[in-house]
Design a protein with these regions (language model features):
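Acidic, surface-exposed loops and disordered segments
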Residues: 1-144
Length: 144
């Protein structure tokens, strides 16, 4: 990961994967999720077919599925980073890394999983530099 100090010096490193295969109807994951709702099999089949049709129309390739599932991992990432901050633990979401190289090192089956984001956790050594952020009114528009 280009020897980024956040990665080389952190105490814990979380690698979040996008589960490409799990969202496909034939994986069985989708069916298990619908069956948890304790509905008749005909209804389960109906929803699986509806889902499969949606997937075929909108997420027709593994690349499209990766793009969507990688975005979904942001929900987990945000929750982890917020929980860490509440506990006083620093973190940094990193998307800038050599994806293929890291996937190879991890030995991922790319038909099932792809690397989405890396999050180092720990405590900073130096004081944090001041943040030069845009004023809120320059980046957010409230619509009434």
């Amino acid at each position: 990961c280009w020897n980024q100090p956040q990665i080389t010096t952190c105490s814990h490193l979380v690698v979040i994967l996008a589960a490409i295969d799990a969202v496909k109807p034939e994986s069985g994951v989708v069916e298990r999720k619908f069956k948890r709702r304790e509905m008749p099999q005909e209804k389960v089949d109906f929803y699986i077919n509806l889902y499969a049709s949606h997937l075929a129309n909108t997420l027709s390739s593994d690349e499209n599925i990766y793009s969507w599932t990688a975005k979904q991992t942001g929900i987990a990432m945000g929750n982890m980073m917020t929980a860490a901050a509440i506990k006083g633990v620093d973190s940094c979401a990193i998307e800038g890394f050599e994806k293929e190289k890291v996937e190879e090192i991890l030995g991922l089956d790319l038909t099932k999983y792809r690397l989405s984001v890396i999050i180092p956790f720990g405590y900073r050594i130096n004081e944090q530099s001041s943040q030069l952020r845009e004023p809120l009114e320059n980046v957010v528009e409230f619509i009434k």
